[in-house]
Structure formats: structure tokens, C-alpha cells
Design a protein with these regions (language model features):
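Membrane-embedded segments
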Residues: 86-90, 96
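Glycine-rich beta-to-alpha active-site loop
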Residues: 80, 96-141
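C-terminal motif of bacterial Sec signal peptides marking the signal peptidase cleavage site
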Residues: 20-22
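Charged, glycine-interspersed solvent-exposed loop segments at helix/strand-loop junctions
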Residues: 73, 141-207
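STAS-typified acidic loop motif
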Residues: 28-60
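Bacterial N-terminal signal peptides that target proteins for export
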Residues: 1-10
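Terminal peptide-recognition signature
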Residues: 49, 74, 118, 196
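Short, glycine-/small-residue-enriched flexible loop/hinge segments at domain edges that mediate gating
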Residues: 70-87, 101-107
Length: 207
């Protein structure tokens, strides 16, 4: 499955989940998932975030914090993932360094690397019906096979980049291992409110 198809699958899965949920929200979900590189729309003290986190995102976030010093929070409306892990973690660290709040709004959808970015918020809020999706990472092995994060021994150095990031964000290490086991890379696990609270992803509880 190519990256755009997977992003679409994540978005459709979230919409199906919303229609089956007992949660009733006034806001409607975006009509289309954001396949383009992540962008921010500024309204006063709020930056609304849409799109896939990629190699351009650190520069975009740096411009955001430098050129819009009044912005205090990022509302992640539709952030279905990332296609560059180091860039994602770099951009996330910029958010934490500035002390910004991150918010998943009602019917907002974030997944995969988007959840990593969310954890960078100094204060983190998930509004009613906001959706957080996680799964294992994967990479191509030397023989052309796919290596899944859940299959790599826990003491392997490949995990270090993510574990160090979560330590910096004060997110328990158990969350990283949970994401690897929750779903394979081709699928997505939509976190329950209980899981969101258990792993410390919100600072004020799920609204």
C-alpha cells in the first residue's frame, strides 16, 4: 500500500469509528484528509494544523514560532502521520521548547507520527470525539523483507531515537512499546480514552 493510500485508509477508518461511536459532536470532520505537507493556519493565538509531517515541517514550525510569537497553541485538526521520523521529532522538540499547547479538537484525527507531534505539547488536550491512532513502524530489511518494530529486540539500538524522545516529552516508555504491539504498520489502533489517560498523553484528562 502506498503512503497516500494508507493515509486515506486511516482517515476512512476514523470516520467509520465516528459513525459507530456513541459520542455526539457538533463539529464535522474534514471532508478530505490532508495528503499534502503539513501547514498551519493562524487565527490569533491559535495555529490550526493540517497535513502530513515531512522533511519541510521543522522549517515550517520554526517559522511559526519565530514569526508568530503570540501563538500559544496548535490545534491538530487533521494530521494523519509523518513520512520522516527524524524531521518529525525535530519539529516536535521545537514545539516543546516554545512551551506550546497541543489540542486534538472534536472530531480531529491524528495518527502515527501525528501522535508523536501531539506529545510535544507542554499542555495537551483531547476534546470530545478527538481521535488518536497508533501502530508499529516498519522498514525495509537488507533482503527486501519488511521489518516491524514489534519484531526487533527491545535492547536494539534502533529503538533509542524514539525512547529518548519520549523521555524528553515525559511520556512513559511503556507507551512506545504499546504502539508497537497495538497494530501492525499497515493498520491503525484508535486509542480509547482510558488508554490516552493511562499513557499520559493528556495533561488534563480527556474532555
Amino acid at each position: 500500500m502506498d503512503s497516500q493510500s494508507f493515509v486515506k485508509a486511516i482517515f476512512v477508518s476514523a470516520l467509520v469509528m465516528a459513525t459507530q461511536s456513541s459520542c455526539i459532536c457538533e463539529r464535522t470532520a474534514p471532508k478530505e484528509p490532508s495528503f499534502e505537507a503539513a501547514v498551519f493556519e493562524i487565527e490569533g493565538e491559535t495555529a490550526f494544523m493540517y497535513g502530513v509531517i515531512d522533511h519541510t515541517t521543522p522549517g515550517v514550525v520554526r517559522a511559526l514560532v519565530d514569526e508568530h510569537p503570540d501563538v500559544t497553541r496548535i490545534v491538530m485538526v487533521d494530521v494523519p502521520g509523518s513520512d520522516d521520523d527524524p524531521a518529525n521529532l525535530e519539529a516536535s522538540r521545537l514545539v516543546r521548547a516554545r512551551g506550546l499547547e497541543t489540542v486534538v479538537p472534536s472530531n480531529g484525527v491524528i495518527a502515527s507520527g501525528g501522535v508523536d507531534f501531539f506529545t510535544a505539547g507542554k499542555n495537551r488536550v483531547v476534546e470530545p470525539c478527538g481521535k488518536l491512532g497508533v501502530h508499529s513502524w516498519d522498514e525495509d530489511g537488507p533482503d527486501g523483507s519488511i521489518i516491524f518494530g514489534s519484531e526487533v529486540p527491545r535492547d536494539h539500538e534502533i529503538h533509542a531515537m524514539f525512547l529518548e524522545f519520549y523521555r524528553e516529552m515525559e511520556i512513559p516508555e511503556d507507551f512506545y512499546w504499546f504502539t508497537l504491539e497495538a497494530a501492525p504498520s499497515q493498520r491503525i489502533h484508535w486509542m480509547s480514552n482510558e488508554e490516552i489517560v493511562l499513557y499520559g498523553l493528556v495533561t488534563e484528562g480527556v474532555q
